[in-house]
A protein has these predicted regions:
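Short linear motifs embedded in intrinsically disordered, charge-biased segments
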Residues: 1-274
C-alpha cells in the first residue's frame, strides 16, 4: 500500500486543509473520495500495485458506500456491491453518519452478553460486590467500545440508562413488574459510577488526548473543519458540540484548560464524579 502513494494523490476530501483519501489498518483499507471518477482512479492504482506483488483485488469483498443514489458500479467488467454501512475496527459506519446505528448494536450485544452470564450472576456462591465487578469488567466494555467517537443524543443517553438498570434488576432478580424505583436499586448495588458516567469520562479523556497531541490525523478528523456547506434546516449535533455542552465551556476556553494538565485532570474528575 505504501507503493501506491495514495497520500500524494489529489483525490479525496479536505479537512482543515489536509487532503484525506484513505484509512489503512492491517488488511482493511478504506478509500475516501468525492466522485465516481476519483474512486475509479484510486481503485485502479491499488489494483495495479497489488498485481505487481502477486496480490489480487477481491471484488466480492470490496464494497462501496455513498451518500448519492449510485446503486451499482463496475470495474474491469465486475460489479461492485453498494452498501448503506460497513464495519471498520469493530464499529459500524453508515452513509448518513448517524451513531445511533452503532449504539443500538452495542446495546444488543450487551444484552446478549448479559444473558450468557446468567449462570454466574445467579449463583449464590458469589457475593454481590463480586457480581457487580464482573458486570463492569465483562459487560460494560462491550457497550462502551468505541464510545469515545460517538455523538450521543438524549435518546441514546436514555437507552444506556435503561440498559444499565435492566442489568442491575436482572442481577438482583427484580422482575420488571416489581414497583421498585431506581434509587433503592442503586443503593443496593453501591455503584460509584454509572454506565453513562463511564462513557462521558472516556469521551472527555479522549478529547484531552486529541487536543494535547500535535497535528495528528485523529485530531484533524475530530476537530478540523470540512470544506463545503452544511444542509439547510436544523443542524445535527456534532461530536465537539457534545464535549463543550458536557463540560459547559466554550471551545476557546477548552483549548486553554487542556494546556494545563492539572486543570484538565480536575475537569475530567469533576465530570466523572457528577
Amino acid at each position: 500500500m505504501q507503493n501506491v502513494r495514495l497520500d500524494e494523490a489529489q483525490a479525496g476530501i479536505k479537512i482543515a486543509g489536509r487532503n484525506i483519501n484513505n484509512l489503512r489498518y492491517a488488511d482493511d483499507t478504506t478509500l475516501i473520495v468525492e466522485s465516481k471518477e476519483e474512486l475509479k482512479s484510486l481503485l485502479m492504482k491499488v489494483k495495479e500495485e497489488s498485481e505487481k506483488v502477486g496480490l489480487k483485488l477481491n471484488i466480492l469483498k470490496t464494497k462501496i458506500m455513498t451518500s448519492s443514489s449510485i446503486t451499482s458500479w463496475k470495474i474491469d467488467g465486475e460489479t461492485m456491491e453498494t452498501v448503506r454501512g460497513f464495519f471498520f475496527l469493530g464499529s459500524k459506519i453508515t452513509a448518513d453518519g448517524d451513531c445511533s446505528h452503532d449504539t443500538n448494536r452495542h446495546l444488543l450485544l450487551g444484552r446478549k452478553a448479559m444473558t450468557k452470564l446468567d449462570s454466574i450472576l445467579k449463583s449464590r456462591d458469589i457475593t454481590l460486590p463480586t457480581k457487580v465487578c464482573l458486570v463492569k469488567a465483562m459487560l460494560f466494555p462491550v457497550d462502551t467500545y468505541g464510545c469515545e467517537s460517538w455523538t450521543i443524543k438524549k435518546t441514546e443517553h436514555w437507552r444506556f440508562d435503561a440498559f444499565e438498570f435492566w442489568c442491575w434488576r436482572r442481577l438482583l432478580r427484580v422482575p420488571w413488574t416489581a414497583r421498585r424505583s431506581s434509587q433503592p436499586i442503586l443503593k443496593e448495588i453501591r455503584s460509584e459510577c454509572s454506565l453513562e458516567g463511564l462513557m462521558l469520562n472516556l469521551k472527555i479523556q479522549y478529547c484531552g488526548y486529541l487536543m494535547q497531541r500535535a497535528d495528528s490525523l485523529e485530531k484533524i478528523l475530530m476537530l478540523g473543519k470540512i470544506e463545503g456547506r452544511r444542509r439547510r434546516g436544523r443542524q445535527r449535533m456534532r461530536w465537539l458540540d457534545g464535549i463543550t455542552h458536557l463540560i459547559d465551556m466554550s471551545l476557546s476556553k477548552l483549548w486553554e484548560i487542556v494546556k494545563e494538565r492539572e486543570a484538565w485532570y480536575a475537569v475530567v474528575h469533576g465530570v466523572a464524579k457528577s
